[in-house]
A protein has these predicted regions:
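Intrinsically disordered, low-complexity terminal regions
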Residues: 1-222
């Protein structure tokens, strides 16, 4: 009897520890796709955390469109704090959409200063994203693919993610740490750094060029 109690206690402790380490809830999609419109305050920065697709479109800020299966909607968080929009999944919850279904959030912007992606999601846009100054960053394996016109651009990749920027920028500073790839355009100046096996390819003929590599990565004109 004592052995049985001890064994049961060990199993319960193990289950508790596993729940803490690996997340406590996995939710499978039910196949019923729905669209939820969410109202927020305005924002000039967008951060995506997790495996979600985000589409940036021109429009009035504060009216987001969230496309997902009905039983997943409640776990998708869209919060604005201090002018920063964060799109994420509820803590300790793992969402598993049905086959051929994805979670997509459409984000209208008037002006934007920063776009950040952490995880395996994707960020893209329709039209041309115009900004005087714009910061873009990927941490993880996600991808950012944008049409951009900016005076100054800063970009960074940490991990295996990719950033592809079509359009024009006068001055560009970019950095890759890891195995990610960067595709950029710069007309006046380009400062590029690669640490690891990642690559930076650029278009344009910037007058000022400052390149440094450490590792097997490469910086080249496309």
């Amino acid at each position: 009897m004592k052995k049985a109690i001890i064994l049961l206690t060990l199993v319960m402790c193990s289950s508790t520890m596993n729940a803490q380490w690996w997340g406590s809830k996995k939710v499978n999609g039910n196949g019923n796709m729905v669209t939820d419109t969410r109202n927020t305050s305005s924002y000039d920065e967008v951060t995506l955390v997790g495996s979600i697709d985000v589409q940036i479109i021109p429009g009035t800020e504060g009216k987001l469109k969230v496309e997902a299966e009905s039983n997943l909607q409640e776990y998708i968080l869209t919060e604005v704090k201090d002018g920063k929009l964060k799109i994420s999944v509820e803590k300790d919850v793992s969402l598993n959409p049905s086959r051929n279904m994805t979670i997509r959030v459409t984000v209208p912007v008037e002006t934007i200063n920063s776009l950040y992606l952490t995880g395996s999601g994707d960020i893209s846009n329709t039209g041309i994203l115009k900004a005087k100054e714009l910061k873009i960053g990927v941490t993880g394996s996600g991808d950012i693919d944008l049409n951009v016109e900016a005076r100054e651009l800063w970009g960074s990749i940490t991990g295996s993610g990719d950033i592809r920027l079509n359009g024009k920028a006068q001055d560009f500073k970019c950095k890759v740490t890891g195995s990610g790839d960067f595709q950029v355009y710069a007309s006046r100046s380009l400062k590029a750094r690669v640490s690891g096996s990642g690559d930076i390819s650029y278009k344009g003929n910037p007058e000022k060029q400052d390149f440094k590599t450490a590792g097997s990565g490469d910086i080249s004109r496309n």
